[in-house]
Amino acid sequence: MHKFTKALAAIGLAAIMSQSAIAESMKLGFLVKQPEEPWFQTEWKFADKAGKDLGFEVIKIAVPDGEKTLNAIDSLAASGAKGFVICTPDPKLGPAIMAKARGYDMKVIAVDDQFANAKGKPMDTVPLVMMAATKIGERQGQELYKIGRAHV
């Protein structure tokens, strides 16, 4: 399910680009905070597949901290990327990420971690793709409770 969600994020980013921007050489970034983790390796794998299927190049960059995140956006812009998907190392970087992206006229989709503004409030205007982990946990708890009650 989560692999599918990540592929949808990449597809969504491609879809929000203008038709004239969608070309054989279109580039989109995929920035992740922990590239050594199998979870993110899988995300990159499916982003590459979406890129191959839809005709865009995925530029994968590790962004373990704020400085590397902002530098990565500069690098993406220099390479001609039209936008990026990001799992930020720190949600409080949201305003800086968005300011830098706007400066380059790049589209952004946040993944997993919702950006927060200076007051710590969610930045609801930034597209977000994530799992409903809380709801999944609640459902698991309910099912475990039922199993436990059945054995009492």
Positions of predicted regions on the chain:
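Extracytoplasmic "Venus flytrap"
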Residues: 27-54, 58-71, 75, 79-81, ...
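Hydrophobic alpha-helical segments within soluble ligand-binding/sensing domains
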Residues: 69, 128-151
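Cleavable N-terminal signal peptides
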Residues: 10-11, 21
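Short beta-strand elements of ligand-binding domains
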Residues: 85-88, 104-120
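Sec/Tat signal peptide C-region and signal peptidase I cleavage site
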Residues: 16-23
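Anion (oxyanion) recognition and catalysis
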Residues: 52, 102-103
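A short acidic, amphipathic alpha-helical/loop segment
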Residues: 72, 96-100
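Bacterial N-terminal signal peptides that target proteins for export
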Residues: 1-9
